[in-house]
Amino acid sequence: MSKPGKPFILNSPFAPSGDQPSAIKKLTEGLQDGLAHQTLLGVTGSGKTFTIANVIAQLNRPAMLLAPNKTLAAQLYAEMKAFFPENAVEYFVSYYDYYQPEAYVPASDTFIEKDASINEQIEQMRLSATKSFLERRDTIVVASVSAIYGLGDVNAYMQMMLHLQVGAIINQRDILARLAELQYTRNDQAFQRSTFRVRGEVIDIFPAESDEIALRIELFDDEIDNLSLFDPLTGHSFGKIPRYTIYPKTHYVTPRERILTAIDQIKNELTGRQDYFIKEHKLLEEQRITQRTQFDIEMINELGYCSGIENYSRYLSGRQEGEPPPTLFDYMPADGLLIIDESHVTVPQIGGMYRGDRARKETLVQYGFRLPSALDNRPLKFEEFERLSPQTIYVSATPGNYELEKSNGDIIDQVVRPTGLLDPIIEVRPVASQVDDVLSEIQQRVALDERVLITTLTKKMAEDLTDYLDEHGVRVRYLHSDIDTVERVEIIHDLRIGMFDVLVGINLLREGLDMPEVALVAILDADKEGFLRSESSLIQTIGRAARNLNGKAILYADRITHSMQKAITETERRREKQQKYNQEHNIIPQALNKKVRELLDIGQTDKQKKGKQAVKIAEQSASYTPNAPKSRQALEKELKQLTQQMQKLAKDLEFEKAAAVRDKIGQLKMALLEV
């Protein structure tokens, strides 16, 4: 398949500065010299993403960015999208909103059926990501660790594509039959993703990987007379095109010949398994495996797929036992780049995925719920991941031993920030008075309209501290592990816009999310050596205050542990280097005024997005801005108007919009107190 050689066009009003130019130069030269592994030690707020964007643009090679979770992947995706608006920036994370894998608990003889809720928007983005890798050189895919999980075989996927060209001889029935093979469904009433409709000699197709473009095929007898793209909502035509390729609805489609071969192989394995269970006098297990597998075979034969078809992926992709599954890496061009963000977290995650998955499946196989071949439906083993990985850049403020070893200890330092901001000042204070001391510090910060993060060791302490601060009039929220990804981003968004001032957490305030408004990080019980108070954890947590001009970290401890000493020494090293650079170049540190980006519409339905847009319109109509000086009379008048607007929206059952107006009222009341 020919791929257009469109270059990456980096869109940024800023030129690289601070340590960025030397980091870009070293990384680019290293990749050109064929280095397989490089490590970028980039401190918080040093513009690591911008450095990577420059490297990609200079080398003009497709890239995959791996992030440790969906939240950071969404943030990276938003940033890369802004840097490369003219190129293909894609998003590839797990498409499950909810996922309960099938499992068997022998102790209670409980079988748990697979139960999942698939997010259609993210499924579309995943299909778009693989399409871009197959079609375009100017592609950046931002992925989570989902990238190491099994995906449909790339060769079978490409074999199933439907290529259409103006002037091609093909009759309507053949096109419809091919669409059915691609698992598209006919729906002449509701035109949505992965469906087609037929009107006379016109076929409209809504591609599975698209969210805003549909294809119209106009036939004349058995010849394609016209191909055109149009807006599926309005019907507005985007113009005629000479050719178009329809991609399958799912990555798991398989040609008919391969399906028939796979069915024979599944039957052979089933026979062997039946003999084994009968020989072992396990008649219940023999009955289970026979019943389940025969039902699946029937479904695959009739429809081309069945529930849990991924458990037969070894046969459907034509692999041998123990071979690595096809993954996103198989769709990636051979000269692609791999960038692992927050590598000190992401790399160990990749290593742990295979073992957890294997333990669950072995139980299913042992008790007759799955054939042994189901064990090959798995994520990549760590050594397979290493073997498949192209040239790799590890990015972290605290690289782990693995990254240092792979890079032969040669680290590219990006410590100096373009803004001239310094690493936070660190103070160590006694544990005995930590709660009262934190309260006093909070009051000082709130008076300056700054935010505070507090990290504790236990859930109980976090809850008690939150209650205590709340009783003392502090606007505080508690971020715990039960909060889902979307709500977590919303809480951090609310902290940034000033809906509350203090966020308390345990292990959720470390990597990644930009919060320039946070001026103080308080680490309680910093001298309790362990996972949450390790050197890298402390450096990452301290780094949350590094984007603020007045950044400060207070470590409450009665003794200086080995981890604390190393974290303090490293922070002081960075601070010294930053100060020296600022003096040499006459740089005055500047506050980082980073826009509060909306990450939350990734993976939301059109209906949810429209609701959010309507909320934004409601916000714009309220002329109140927190920093605009207004008289008390004007504020009271506006408060009255907004209250009426909120009541009307609530009466009309427009609760999302009403909640947005309610938040405005809260800000307005705070402004009134200050007048």
UniProtKB/Swiss-Prot annotation:
Residue span, UVR domain: 636-671
Subcellular localization(s) per the UniProt record: Cytoplasm
PROSITE patterns hit by this protein: HELICASE_ATP_BIND_1, HELICASE_CTER, UVR
InterPro entries assigned: Helicase/UvrB_N, Helicase_ATP-bd, Helicase_C-like, P-loop_NTPase, UVR_dom, UVR_dom_sf, UvrB, UvrB_inter
Residue ranges of domain Helicase ATP-binding in the record: 29-414
Location, primary (coarse class): cytoplasm
Entry's transmembrane regions: none
GO biological process terms on file: nucleotide-excision repair; SOS response
Helicase C-terminal domain segment(s): 434-600
Source taxon at top rank: Bacteria
Molecular function GO labels: ATP binding; ATP hydrolysis activity; DNA binding; excinuclease ABC activity
Record keywords: ATP-binding, Cytoplasm, DNA damage, DNA excision, DNA repair, Excision nuclease, Nucleotide-binding, SOS response
Binding site for ATP: 42-49
Any one GO CC term of the record: excinuclease repair complex
Motif placement: Beta-hairpin: 95-118
SMART domains in UniProt: DEXDc (SM00487), HELICc (SM00490)
Any Pfam family the entry gives: ResIII
Record text about domains: The beta-hairpin motif is involved in DNA binding.
Similarity comment: Belongs to the UvrB family.
Described function: The UvrABC repair system catalyzes the recognition and processing of DNA lesions. A damage recognition complex composed of 2 UvrA and 2 UvrB subunits scans DNA for abnormalities. Upon binding of the UvrA(2)B(2) complex to a putative damaged site, the DNA wraps around one UvrB monomer. DNA wrap is dependent on ATP binding by UvrB and probably causes local melting of the DNA helix, facilitating insertion of UvrB beta-hairpin between the DNA strands. Then UvrB probes one DNA strand for the presence of a lesion.
Name under which the protein is recorded: UvrABC system protein B
Lineage, top ranks: Bacteria, Pseudomonadati, Pseudomonadota, Gammaproteobacteria, Pasteurellales
Gene behind this protein: uvrB
